[in-house]
Amino acid sequence: QLAEQCEALEQGLLELAQGLLAQVRRHPFTLLPTRLIEQRTSARTTFLRWQHIASRRMGVGVWAEMLRQDKTPEYLLQDLYEMELQRITLNMQISLIHSIGKQAAECAEKMGQAEAEFMGRLQQSQARPGYVGM
């Protein structure tokens, strides 16, 4: 149940991420040499990453480099800063919820295995002749 709740929360966070991506994909941000993209991980979750359009380099360094460039208009700096704060927060929340959900699913599986062993032992005992329950 907790794993399912975490999955739903993660989907909600990914929807928030889509809102941030939509904002970055609008003018005047489309004029910048850096874009915000979704990156799917081997752990089957998605994070937001800054990517330089020409070189395809990724990471916060790409964002910092864009901020330092004189070509980046000053009127965009505050928005870019706030977008980066949102990106950091969303990535942290996605990471935490994904991790908690994974742990909850593994825990539920182990509990199911423990219950199966326990029930198997009880059924084995009850099937014996002369069984007297406690």
Tell what function each PLM region has:
Residues 18-54:
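Amphipathic, interaction-prone secondary-structure segments
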Residues 1-31, 126, 130:
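Negatively charged, low-complexity tracts enriched in Asp/Glu with abundant Ser/Thr
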Residues 32-40, 117-134:
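Helical coiled-coil/dimerization "stalks"
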Residues 6-16, 76, 80-104, 111:
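Amphipathic alpha-helical coiled-coil segments
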